[in-house]
């Protein structure tokens, strides 16, 4: 029997999968699709259960799992599920363009779907809406009608919807989806919830992790650096455990991104592709900052700015901006033309490097500097948890990898791939500066959990526990009794 995984049984729980048949000529190819648990499911279900007259617009890079998750939840929660894909159905867009009112819009929907729309029991999923921008404007009238629920989705939404003049304020909720974060990856690989909760407790109480579990979690994190979080790639790994299959799937996604560049921005195609192709080498440089002169000796940021924005808005790249000082709010001191550019998925980044990097990561080859992939994983994790990305660099004080804001306080983070994780002069400099008033910092590495003054040394996999605190209920009623009219 083929060995499905190398992780011990006490870390594992049962995985659910379905078999899909693909008919190609006379051949039937069976492929195993694992039901990946996604955190976005909770937000989508909350929307489906709400009584608000709003639509939900789900954004995210191509192939992060938007369409699959919406279909699964829509069919599970609604008697009638209608899907219209504006990329596959070119006539659908023209039908909406010609609609003049809510009645004609709904008639067009019913005609395109070739099914009756059941009031209060129908979810209408409009996919690839970047191909029909008019529907985003028209959604206000559809949700005001109140008889049907609407979810909109598509790839490159940040790019293609920038120029819409009439975005329906107050009629749309928004949700960003990303590749699987590390916790989702752990669950996909069968790590039990009790193990994750035990690790979370260790993180919150600053207690060392059991050495056996710590060692195996590091192995799983190394696998994450190679596989990444793109659902198709994760499913391919779970089905075969074959890294060659993983790399082929990743290469396919990278090529799809490049085709999108040619299709959606042909005028700036060469600039965008050049920047995209430079990301791995720039991250492998000493300071990891994107050096503009690599693009052109006479580089002017204004000339290339839209190309950088395209990669960001398409969800392909994650810019991390330099700030002048580690003070809250960080956005006020960011420098827009000084940044690092990470890939949206660490597995895709690893696939863009040559020389069997994947094997070297998994074997822990000491001669290789894994700093770029470790930092990319950190950028990806922080982004998935809703943090804008910043770093600090100062000639006198040095550079700190990431700065985040938690509860209004700046929290610096260093990412260390080697054994010298306690060496961090720049971090020491800003912690000792009383003007910055920084109370806590993290150093993430392969070491077990420990503390030293303001610094928490945590295992790299515990990045999954860095979260924004949810706002608590704050009921406040001012005393305005003297202002009220006498009754």
Predicted regions and their residues:
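Accessory nucleic acid-recognition modules appended to NTPase machines
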Residues: 8, 19, 235-407
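Pre-Walker A adenine-sensing motif
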Residues: 36-51
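Conserved lysine of the Walker
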Residues: 66
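Hydrophobic positions on the alpha1 helix immediately C-terminal to the Walker A/P-loop
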Residues: 69, 73
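Short glycine-rich substrate-engagement loop in P-loop NTPases that contacts/grips substrate
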Residues: 88-119
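Structural recognition of the conserved hydrophobic beta-strand(s) that form the central parallel beta-sheet
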Residues: 149-155, 176
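Interdomain motor-coupling "hinge/lid" segment immediately C-terminal to the ATP-binding subdomain
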Residues: 161-285
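Domain-level recognition of nuclease-like catalytic cores that cleave nucleotide substrates
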Residues: 447-487
């Amino acid at each position: 029997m083929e060995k499905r995984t190398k992780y011990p049984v006490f870390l594992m729980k049962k995985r659910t999968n379905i078999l899909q048949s693909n008919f190609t000529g006379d051949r039937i190819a069976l492929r195993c699709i694992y039901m990946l648990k996604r955190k976005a499911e909770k937000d989508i279900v909350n929307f489906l259960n709400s009584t608000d007259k709003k639509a939900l617009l789900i954004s995210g890079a191509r192939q992060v799992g938007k369409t699959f998750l919406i279909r699964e939840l829509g069919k599970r929660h609604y008697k009638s599920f209608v899907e219209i894909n504006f990329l596959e159905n070119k006539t659908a867009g023209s039908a909406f363009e010609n609609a003049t009112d809510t009645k004609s819009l709904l008639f067009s929907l019913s005609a395109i779907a070739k099914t009756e729309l059941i009031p209060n029991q129908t979810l209408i999923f409009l996919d690839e809406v970047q191909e029909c921008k008019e529907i985003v404007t028209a959604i206000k009238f559809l949700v005001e009608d109140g008889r049907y629920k609407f979810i909109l989705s598509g790839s490159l939404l940040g790019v293609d919807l920038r120029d819409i003049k009439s975005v329906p304020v107050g009629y749309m909720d928004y949700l960003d989806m990303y590749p699987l974060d590390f916790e989702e990856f752990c669950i996909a690989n069968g790590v039990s919830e009790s193990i994750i909760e035990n690790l979370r407790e260790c993180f919150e109480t600053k207690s060392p992790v059991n050495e056996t579990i710590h060692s195996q979690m590091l192995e799983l994190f190394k696998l994450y650096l190679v596989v990444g979080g793109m659902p198709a790639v994760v499913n391919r790994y779970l089905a075969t455990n074959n890294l060659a299959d993983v790399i082929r799937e990743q290469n396919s996604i990278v090529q799809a991104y490049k085709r999108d560049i040619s299709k959606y921005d042909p005028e700036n195609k060469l600039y965008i592709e050049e920047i995209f192709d430079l990301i791995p080498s720039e991250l492998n440089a000493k300071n990891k900052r994107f050096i503009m002169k690599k693009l052109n000796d006479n580089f002017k940021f204004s000339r290339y700015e839209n190309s950088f924005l395209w990669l960001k808005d398409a969800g392909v790249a994650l810019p991390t901006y330099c700030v002048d000082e580690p003070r809250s709010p960080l956005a006020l001191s960011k420098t827009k033309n000084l940044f690092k550019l990470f890939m949206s998925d660490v597995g895709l980044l690893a696939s863009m490097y040559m020389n069997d990097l994947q094997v070297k990561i998994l074997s822990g080859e000491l001669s290789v500097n894994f700093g770029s992939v470790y930092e990319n994983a950190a950028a990806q994790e922080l982004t998935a948890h809703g943090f804008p990305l910043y770093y600090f660099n100062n000639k006198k004080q040095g550079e700190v990898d990431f700065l985040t804001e938690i509860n209004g306080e700046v929290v610096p983070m260093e990412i260390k791939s080697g054994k010298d994780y306690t060496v961090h002069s720049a971090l020491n400099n800003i912690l000792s500066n009383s003007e910055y008033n920084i109370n806590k910092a993290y150093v993430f590495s392969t070491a077990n959990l420990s503390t030293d003054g303001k610094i928490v040394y945590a295992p790299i996999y515990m990045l999954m526990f860095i979260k924004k605190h949810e706002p608590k209920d704050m009921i406040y009623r001012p005393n305005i009794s003297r202002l009220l009219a006498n009754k």
